[in-house]
Every structure is written in structure tokens, then in C-alpha cells.
Swiss-Prot record:
The lineage of its organism: Bacteria, Pseudomonadati, Pseudomonadota, Alphaproteobacteria, Acetobacterales. Keywords: ATP-binding, Cell inner membrane, Cell membrane, Membrane, Nucleotide-binding, Phosphate transport, Translocase, Transport. The complex is composed of two ATP-binding proteins (PstB), two transmembrane proteins (PstC and PstA) and a solute-binding protein (PstS). The gene is pstB. It is found in: Cell inner membrane. InterPro entries: AAA+_ATPase, ABC_transporter-like_ATP-bd, ABC_transporter-like_CS, P-loop_NTPase, PstB-like. ATP binds at residues 72-79. Belongs to the ABC transporter superfamily. Phosphate importer (TC 3.A.1.7) family. This is Phosphate import ATP-binding protein PstB. Gene3D superfamilies: P-loop containing nucleotide triphosphate hydrolases (3.40.50.300). GO terms for biological process: phosphate ion transmembrane transport. The keyword Disulfide bond does not apply. It is a peripheral membrane protein.
Length: 286
């Protein structure tokens, strides 16, 4: 593996994006990926905004207890795909999906699927932190009450568990009943992650979760993602190549509504099969 990275570093040094590509390769090579079966299987998926076809015949797997990084220029369809995985698009008239999104073999695009159950199994964290206008405690308890009836002691235990998993408990344990709006941006985003995992989903979708955060808060979120994949399947949309190399086990590159290429992070950042992938990764467009 080291020799592969060295080879890429030497080859990449001949072009303008060489040093950046070599750095991405080194980051990807440092990750340890455990092989697993697909948790979500997307098959022949087309998606429409009215008459506009935004996604074209997408087929890809999201492997269990791995991180799938989704990269590509703005408007390429990666965030659209993320919202299809837990049927968020159904909230908006005129949007429709054709094909299959199989969660443990069940097509979640079917009309008889209970979207509330689906979204408890496949949780989502958005680009901008979205704490509810209530206390830190109630931000997490709110979602739990929709799905479970817990005693006060059980609720307290679940909230401590979720805040601990989100690397936030030590920072807020003495002010749980104060307004979440008083937290920093990075803390608010970790609160949103805690709120998501509090209902014990199987999959976590992250849509550019650090784009509005400072570098220190970004690092905390990235470390958290690496920790959470031990128990959750994760898909993350990012415009940051370094973040994809640091966080993702597999990477999917999208361009103009098409899935151009998907592979391990190491393969994608050292030896992409498609010229468009190479050009995007090295910053020649995007």
C-alpha cells in the first residue's frame, strides 16, 4: 500500500494537482476498512423534478458499518440521492423516483412504506445545524417520544447515551435544560447528530455536515463520524476532497446526474478508472 501511494505521488507530481492528489492518496491509504455486505442497494434509480431528470440510472451500494463519501460538483445529484434514501423527497410535490432503493432487501420507494418508520431507521443531518427552539434535553427527547414510551429514568439514560456518542455530554451535562440556541455552531451540529442517533437508526445520512463550521469543529465531526461507523452505516455528501479521503471507506463520484465511478477511497484517490474522476479530484474542474 505504501508503495502504491509513493508511485501515485511521483506520477502526480508532474501535473498541477499533483501534490494535492498525493496528499489525498496518503489520507485514504491510512484508513482501515472492514469488508461488509450492502445495507442499502440502489438499483436503476431515476429521479425527476417535474419533467427534469436529475438522476440517471443510478446503481450503487452503501455497505453496512462503512462510510460512503459522495463527491462531485454542485448540482451533480449527490444531495438529491441522499434525500431519496429516506424518502425526504416525498415532502415536495412534483418530485418522483423510479427504480429501487433496497434497505435490507425492502424497496423503500414503495407506496406502502411507512415513512415515519423509515426515517427512524435512516436518519438525516443537514448542512446547516437545525436545533429545535427548545432546551438541549428536549431537542433529543422530542424525537424519542415519537417512537418510544420511556420512563423518566430511561429517557435520562438515553439522552446521556446519545450525547456521549455525539462527543457532547461533557460539554453540556450541566446545562441540559438551557436553550440549544445558545450553543456554538459546532455544538449545535453535534446536537443534531445526537438527536438523530437517539432513536437508534441503522443508517445516518450527512449532507455536508461541516460546510458551515470552523476547522476545529469540523475535525470533531470527522472524528465522530469515524467513531459512529462502528455501530451505524453512514453516507456523507461533501465538497471537500480531504474530508472524503479522511472519512470515507468508499467514495462515489457524481457528475451531471450520473454516477461516474465508485470504489474504495484508496482506489478512487490513487487510481481512478475514469478521466473525469481524475480531473475532478485534482481540481481541474468543479
Amino acid at each position: 500500500m505504501v508503495s502504491t501511494v509513493s508511485q501515485v505521488s511521483r506520477t502526480a507530481s508532474h501535473d498541477a494537482g499533483g501534490s494535492a492528489a498525493a496528499g489525498l492518496a496518503a489520507m485514504a491509504a491510512s484508513r482501515v476498512m472492514v469488508e461488509s455486505q450492502p445495507k442499502i442497494a440502489v438499483r436503476n434509480l431515476d429521479f425527476y423534478y417535474g419533467s427534469h431528470k436529475a438522476l440517471k440510472s443510478i446503481s450503487l451500494d452503501v455497505h453496512e458499518r462503512q462510510v460512503l463519501g459522495m463527491i462531485g460538483p454542485s448540482g451533480c445529484g449527490k444531495s438529491t440521492l441522499l434525500r431519496i434514501l429516506n424518502k425526504m423527497y416525498a415532502l415536495y410535490p412534483g418530485q418522483r423516483a423510479e427504480g429501487e432503493v433496497l434497505l435490507d432487501g425492502e424497496n423503500v420507494l414503495g407506496k406502502d412504506v411507512d415513512v415515519n418508520v423509515l426515517r427512524s431507521r435512516v436518519g438525516m443531518v443537514f448542512q446547516k445545524p437545525t436545533p429545535f427552539p427548545m432546551s438541549i434535553y428536549e431537542n433529543i427527547a422530542f424525537g424519542i417520544r415519537l417512537h418510544e414510551k420511556l420512563s423518566k429514568a430511561e429517557m435520562d439514560e438515553r439522552i446521556e447515551w446519545s450525547l456521549t456518542r455525539a462527543a457532547l455530554w461533557s460539554e453540556v451535562k450541566d446545562r441540559l435544560h438551557t436553550a440549544a440556541a445558545g450553543m456554538s455552531g459546532g455544538q449545535q451540529q453535534r446536537l443534531c447528530i445526537a438527536r438523530t442517533i437517539a432513536v437508534k437508526p441503522e443508517v445516518i445520512l450527512l449532507d455536508e455536515p461541516t460546510s458551515a463550521l470552523d476547522p476545529i469543529s469540523t475535525l470533531k465531526i470527522e472524528e465522530l463520524v469515524d467513531e459512529l461507523k462502528r455501530d451505524f452505516t453512514i453516507a456523507i455528501v461533501t465538497h471537500n476532497m480531504q474530508q472524503a479521503a479522511r472519512c470515507a471507506d468508499r467514495v462515489a463520484f457524481f457528475y451531471m446526474g450520473e454516477l461516474v465511478e465508485v470504489g474504495t477511497a484508496l482506489d478512487m484517490f490513487t487510481n481512478p478508472r475514469e478521466q473525469r474522476t481524475q480531473e475532478y479530484i485534482t481540481g481541474r474542474f468543479g
